[in-house]
Amino acid sequence: ENAKEFVLIDFFIVAEGGLWDKMHDILKRKIKEGVEVKFLYDDFGAAIRTRKYFKQILEHEGFEVRVFNPIMKYTSQLYMNFRSHQKIMVIDGKVGYTGGFNLARFGVWKDTGIRVRGDAVWGLTVVFLQMWEASGHDKEHVDYLKYKVMQDVQGDTWCQVISDGPVNNPKNPIESIYNQMIMYSDQ
């Protein structure tokens, strides 16, 4: 609700209902206030949980929308395992959220999410923009620096964002990092 410049959103599962409806109302209001909203979702995670023209409805409301790996009816090449399970939200380049949660309710469900401030937000922004570019049909390059915000955050916690999704495979940086941490551990 405090966004002034932009909101970047990337989720695997989007389901119409309480959680999405509340966020949708806030985002529509922010768009009317002039806030840029980029919304990216995985088609497999939303296809059976949203209405038929979900993307077009959002675009009509002023959202910039991209769908990762759209499911095309009657196609012989369905890439069902090539999905984006990333969950990212960046607000004005100052606050970022990520974790295991989706924009859907699944009954009693415990999950973890984190809020980050400082330079880690830029890491989430870059991951989002890489997926945004990969999900576009045009080859236009996104001006990443438009979303770079100089942070004035003090703290003693270090955080590094590492992307390991469809844009980065087959390199699997997360696996390499875990292997390296195990190799160099003292215990």
Locate each region found by the language model:
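Charged, low-complexity intrinsically disordered terminal segments
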Residues: 1-187
